[in-house]
């Protein structure tokens, strides 16, 4: 009798994707983040579903309904804390996953990379509309500030902003539609994840050396299922530690006050995972310029495959590119810090320098480093 796993139409797909999938024998722990992101997505959808059962998307009751979830619903506090901190874990894994892709040249699988960038943008949109739902002070003012950026678009900007709001400001209509978006987007993300995997399994995984691994492949199960399980243990350890011991560590105290359109918080800032982009937005004194820089900071990922000048795919044996990569990582941490600081000196100038360095590194220095390394590798005799 043939194995059902290899013959059943549905089981066969799962088998080829997660069990008998040929994987390079040398992929490191940096390749764990794909599976961790899948698990994060499942956690977010499940906890979100249970939260949606008790949440009301009305300006009068939204804040109270979140308080009700935490106080009166069985384990509601845990579900909410897992959902809020699960988003942080999701973005932590996302950033590490993208960083891995840049370091090891995975972006040369262009289709997989482009779908990945679309996934990142969709996840950011989902997190943004989700942050508005508790209808606290930072929810309201964050929504007001970010949606207001649309009005910077010439000619159609104001009309577009009012169309998104469903009125002349962020109000009941905005909250209702943001809840609808927040509910549907994770399922769109799930569909995109399947497409992402489809393209990835068309080419096979990259590996740290960046050379073709076809001559040395091993089955995904049991080798990488057990390796991913270890990563999962670490993920759950961090997530549960956050959710159970310091659930509000990454949140903003202003969000414990109900939304009040008549009182602006002293410092309006988004969640930590958007601070780098927020710092780039604020570093340009012009509104439209800031919006364009904000978009460029993420969309720049789409042109990275075309900026690859090195003869080697991975940065594993390219010390100059490695140095620039870690400068870029430190620069992003600096931008994240600046995004959370008030708009005053010396933070303004630090933010402007860090924003400039961000684009300079990706657009100029890293491509030049690739060319320089090619030159250094040529025999000189």
Swiss-Prot record:
Gene: MT-CYB
Residue numbers binding a ubiquinone: 201
Gene3D superfamilies in the cross-refs: Cytochrome Bc1 Complex, Chain C (1.20.810.10)
Family: Belongs to the cytochrome b family.
Comment field (misc): Heme 1 (or BL or b562) is low-potential and absorbs at about 562 nm, and heme 2 (or BH or b566) is high-potential and absorbs at about 566 nm.
Protein's membrane topology: Multi-pass membrane protein
Positions that bind heme b b566: 97, 196
Assembly with partners or alone: The cytochrome bc1 complex contains 11 subunits: 3 respiratory subunits (MT-CYB, CYC1 and UQCRFS1), 2 core proteins (UQCRC1 and UQCRC2) and 6 low-molecular weight proteins (UQCRH/QCR6, UQCRB/QCR7, UQCRQ/QCR8, UQCR10/QCR9, UQCR11/QCR10 and a cleavage product of UQCRFS1). This cytochrome bc1 complex then forms a dimer.
Cellular-component GO terms for this entry: mitochondrial inner membrane; respiratory chain complex III
A Pfam short name: Cytochrome_B
Function: Component of the ubiquinol-cytochrome c reductase complex (complex III or cytochrome b-c1 complex) that is part of the mitochondrial respiratory chain. The b-c1 complex mediates electron transfer from ubiquinol to cytochrome c. Contributes to the generation of a proton gradient across the mitochondrial membrane that is then used for ATP synthesis.
Note on cofactor: Binds 2 heme b groups non-covalently.
Annotated protein name in UniProt: Cytochrome b
Stored InterPro entries: Cyt_b/b6_C, Cyt_b/b6_C_sf, Cyt_b/b6_N, Cytb/b6-like_sf, Cytochrome_b, Cytochrome_b_C_euk/bac, Cytochrome_b_N_euk/bac, Di-haem_cyt_TM
Annotated TM spans: 33-53, 77-98, 113-133, 178-198, 226-246, 288-308, 320-340, 347-367
Listed cofactors: heme b
Organism: Antechinomys laniger (Eastern jerboa marsupial)
Places the protein is found: Mitochondrion inner membrane
GO MF, one annotated term: ubiquinol-cytochrome-c reductase activity
């Amino acid at each position: 009798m043939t194995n059902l796993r290899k013959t059943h139409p549905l089981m066969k797909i799962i088998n080829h994707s997660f069990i008998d999938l040929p994987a390079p024998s040398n992929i490191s722990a940096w390749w764990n983040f794909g599976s961790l992101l899948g698990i994060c997505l499942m956690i977010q959808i499940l906890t979100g579903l249970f939260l949606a059962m008790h949440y009301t998307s009305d300006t009068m009751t939204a804040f109270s309904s979140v308080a009700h979830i935490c106080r009166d619903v069985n384990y509601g506090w845990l579900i909410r804390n897992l959902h809020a901190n699960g988003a942080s874990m999701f973005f932590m894994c996302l950033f590490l996953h993208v960083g891995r892709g840049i370091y090891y040249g995975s972006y040369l699988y262009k289709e997989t990379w482009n779908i990945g960038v679309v996934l990142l943008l969709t996840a950011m949109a989902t997190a943004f509309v989700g942050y508005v739902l508790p209808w606290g002070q930072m929810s309201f003012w964050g929504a007001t500030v970010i949606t207001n950026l649309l009005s910077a678009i010439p000619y159609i900007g104001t009309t577009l902003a009012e169309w998104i709001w469903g009125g002349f400001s962020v109000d009941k209509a905005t909250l209702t539609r943001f809840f609808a978006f927040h509910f549907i987007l994770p399922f769109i993300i799930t569909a995109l994840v399947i497409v992402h995997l489809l393209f990835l399994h068309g080419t096979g995984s990259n590996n740290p050396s960046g050379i073709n691994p076809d001559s040395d492949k091993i089955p995904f199960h049991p080798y990488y299922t057990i390796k991913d399980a270890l990563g999962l243990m670490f993920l759950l350890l961090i997530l549960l530690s956050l959710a159970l011991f310091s659930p509000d560590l990454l949140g903003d105290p202003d969000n414990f006050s109900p939304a009040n359109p008549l009182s602006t918080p002293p410092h309006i800032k988004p969640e930590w995972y958007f601070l780098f982009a927020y710092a780039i937005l604020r570093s340009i004194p012009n509104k439209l310029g800031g919006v364009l820089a904000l978009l460029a900071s993420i969309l720049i990922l789409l042109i990275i495959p075309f900026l690859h000048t090195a003869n080697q795919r991975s940065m594993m044996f390219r010390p100059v590119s490695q140095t620039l990569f870690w400068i870029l990582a430190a620069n992003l941490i600096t931008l994240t810090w600046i995004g959370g600081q008030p708009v005053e000196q010396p933070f303004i100038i630090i933010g402007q320098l860090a924003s400039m360095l961000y684009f300079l590194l990706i657009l100029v220095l890293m491509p030049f480093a690739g060319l320089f390394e090619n030159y250094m590798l040529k025999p000189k005799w």
